[in-house]
Amino acid sequence: MVLKLYVRKSLNLSENEMTKEMIHAGICLCEHETPNDIMIFKVDDNEFFKLIQNSRDIKFENVIRKKKIGDEYVDSWYGILF
């Protein structure tokens, strides 16, 4: 199952640097950014915890399985990148 990973852009990293960090963690870029400074990545549900372990400087908080988009909830992971 493929989920979307919503990551708030870090003030300390450029978008290019952040994308490289996510790719290093094995996460493929799905959409570059949204109006809310959130970058959206595609991630396989079964790989999620392995991706977290493999990431170097990426820390995820407030991990949830459902994210409300408009009036509907979608399967997703939500993380804040520091």
Summary of predicted features, one role per range:
Residues 1-82:
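Positively charged, small/polar-rich N-terminal and surface patches that mediate targeting and assembly
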